[in-house]
């Protein structure tokens, strides 16, 4: 691995496939460098973790209901026994709508992607085809050096 990387091959691979599975060193640091390269090339990165995402299609592209913890305080007879429902805007769609005018697109950088199921990874693979300004990077595990491959190949390897 060279000391200084420009990240051009990473960005070309991301633009070509739309969704990448990356394997990063466990000590960290490399993903920040590549996110900085993305930002310098006109993309807007957005970090989120795969833990607790729930239904990816509704969380990323559809308005979905959330029931926050009630912390022992309930309204008796006025609301449902499980608490009120708050409707949250979709993360990816909302971020795409608020992109700066000169931005090339949005890059969803999902950490801890190894816990996602095969169906969820397949959904993430086809999401950039539905919305061309959206790119996906999923951290699929650890490696001794920073490497990437199209997310379709990560599905086949799993």
Swiss-Prot record:
Its EC number is 7.1.1.-. It catalyses: a plastoquinone + NADH + (n+1) H(+)(in) = a plastoquinol + NAD(+) + n H(+)(out); a plastoquinone + NADPH + (n+1) H(+)(in) = a plastoquinol + NADP(+) + n H(+)(out). Its main location: membrane. It is a peripheral membrane protein. It holds the Pfam family NdhN. One of its GO terms (cellular component) is plasma membrane-derived thylakoid membrane. It comes from the Bacteria. It is found in: Cellular thylakoid membrane. Keywords: Membrane, NAD, NADP, Plastoquinone, Quinone, Thylakoid, Translocase, Transport. GO terms for molecular function: oxidoreductase activity, acting on NAD(P)H, quinone or similar compound as acceptor; quinone binding. NDH-1 can be composed of about 15 different subunits; different subcomplexes with different compositions have been identified which probably have different functions. NDH-1 shuttles electrons from an unknown electron donor, via FMN and iron-sulfur (Fe-S) centers, to quinones in the respiratory and/or the photosynthetic chain. The immediate electron acceptor for the enzyme in this species is believed to be plastoquinone. Couples the redox reaction to proton translocation, and thus conserves the redox energy in a proton gradient. Cyanobacterial NDH-1 also plays a role in inorganic carbon-concentration. Belongs to the complex I NdhN subunit family. This is NAD(P)H-quinone oxidoreductase subunit N.
